Amino acid sequence: MRQPAVANPVIKESQFEGWVPEQFGQWKTISQSGVVLPPPDTLSDRLYDNLITQVYAAPGLPAVMLLLAYNNAQDGVLQVHRPEVCYPVGGFELSATREMDIQVGSKTIPANFFTATSPNRIEQVAYFTRLGRAYPRSWAEQRIAVMQANLEGDIPDGIMMRVSVLSADAGRAEDQLQDFSRAFITAAPAPLRRVLLGTAT
């Protein structure tokens, strides 16, 4: 059995940023601030090749905060930070995480949803992670995805797409974040869509 090798090249930061649409459908970029970021640590420079934050607005809807975190090589040490780590570090208390799905055409993306609460902010959060061909919903599934790819001879790439809104209404926010995610992925240029979905389409 051959040693696992990196299956995907590094994507230049400027190239990755250029793939992220500033406007699609009714949504338009208004800011890059206000997004809860992964905590800094000794691995920060190695955790992500690309870390993008944007805030999108649409008429009559709460603004959506977007975070994309990508690394071309996810091994047993360097794995995408899950939001359940980032938010408590920022002083938030979290609800239980529940499963949700994001439907993009014929593809169903397994995702997670939770509520993050701080003294001055209630944020509804949805996210998914892709590692190689897998969409792990938990740390355990994430580790299994890395091991399975390694057994196939690959060190997989990994991305997390996280979207959130400031709202006390979890049900309405979940619907909005599903709709936003579907529209964003559909509108993304082919290279970004391939990174998000792990396919050439």
Segments the model singles out, each with a brief description of its role:
Residues F24, K28-S31, G60, I155, ...:
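Sec/Tat-exported extracytoplasmic proteins
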Residues A63-M65, P156-V163:
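Glycine-rich, often proline-containing surface loops adjacent to acidic residues and nearby aromatics
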Residues Q3-Q23:
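Alpha-helical transmembrane signal-anchor/signal-peptide segments
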Residues S31-A149:
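Short, solvent-exposed recognition patches
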Residues L51, P156, D179:
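Short, well-structured alpha-helical interface segments that form or flank functional binding sites
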Residues I159-T201:
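Surface-exposed amphipathic alpha-helical segments
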Residues N150-P156:
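Accessory, solvent-exposed terminal regions and/or long lumenal/extracellular loops of proteins
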